UniProtKB/Swiss-Prot annotation:
Family annotation (PANTHER family): DNAA INITIATOR-ASSOCIATING PROTEIN DIAA, SEDOHEPTULOSE 7-PHOSPHATE ISOMERASE / DNAA INITIATOR-ASSOCIATING FACTOR FOR REPLICATION INITIATION
Family: Belongs to the SIS family. DiaA subfamily.
Membrane-spanning parts: none
BP GO terms, sorted: carbohydrate derivative metabolic process; DNA replication
Gene Ontology MF, one: carbohydrate derivative binding
The SIS domain, residue ranges: 34-196
Assembly and binders: Homotetramer; dimer of dimers.
Superkingdom assignment: Bacteria
Organism of provenance: Shigella flexneri serotype 5b (strain 8401)
Keyword vocabulary terms for this entry: DNA replication
Family matches, as CDD domains: SIS_GmhA
Protein name in the entry: DnaA initiator-associating protein DiaA
Free-text function comment from the UniProt entry: Required for the timely initiation of chromosomal replication via direct interactions with the DnaA initiator protein.
Length: 196
């Protein structure tokens, strides 16, 4: 059991090192995309399933409340938090539309959709991205594996942050770290610290 624990930590560290080498440009582009949208008076819509939903909620909460330092609230909405809306849509046998309907209702040109999907093939996330495209929104996609169907939907203005791994647990860990990185970059770009 001890060796398995060490192997989990080692694999996680190796994934972090690979991501640190492969992803800085994509993360930087994503952060600047989010910052520019906020500076233009727009908002960020976020969605994901399971652990990805938790990462989406964490991002939205960090924007609305704060990340590590006090600052004004920033407009972000996690689309997976309203159980009444989600179950009403799902009850009409529209499971694949639970996020797309919300994107069509709440999204506007200039807004950003932060779509989180480890494999990039979740039907409801794919449909949300398709809806965001019709609303002239920009997409920041957090994926893994080969990017899945989601990667093929992205245009030149969009950003994919694809974790270099084929293990869902490692991808989800790195998605959380990436969300924290994005929050840090947004805060330090919009509200630079005097002592930095």
């Amino acid at each position: 059991m001890q060796e398995r624990i060490k192997a989990c930590f080692t694999e996680s560290i190796q994934t972090q090192i690979a991501a640190a080498e492969a992803l800085p440009d994509a993360i930087s582009r994503a952060a600047m995309t989010l910052v520019q949208s906020l500076l233009n008076g727009n908002k960020i819509l976020c969605c994901g399933n399971g652990t990805s939903a938790a990462n989406a909620q964490h991002f939205a909460a960090s924007m609305i409340n704060r990340f590590e330092t006090e600052r004004p609230s920033l407009p972000a909405i996690a689309l997976n938090t309203d159980n009444v809306v989600l179950t009403a849509i799902a009850n009409d046998r529209l499971h694949d539309e639970v996020y797309a309907k919300q994107v069509r209702a709440l999204g506007h040109a200039g807004d950003v959709l932060l779509a989180i999907s480890a494999r990039g093939n979740s039907r409801d996330i794919v449909k949300a991205v398709e809806a965001a495209v019709t609303r002239d929104m920009t997409i920041v996609a957090l994926t893994g594996y080969d990017g899945g169907e989601l990667a093929g939907l992205l245009g030149p203005q969009d950003v994919e942050i694809r974790i270099p791994s084929h293990r869902s647990a490692r991808i989800q860990e790195m998605h959380m770290l990436t969300v924290n990185c994005l929050c840090d970059l947004i805060d330090n770009t919009l509200f630079p610290h005097q002592d930095d």
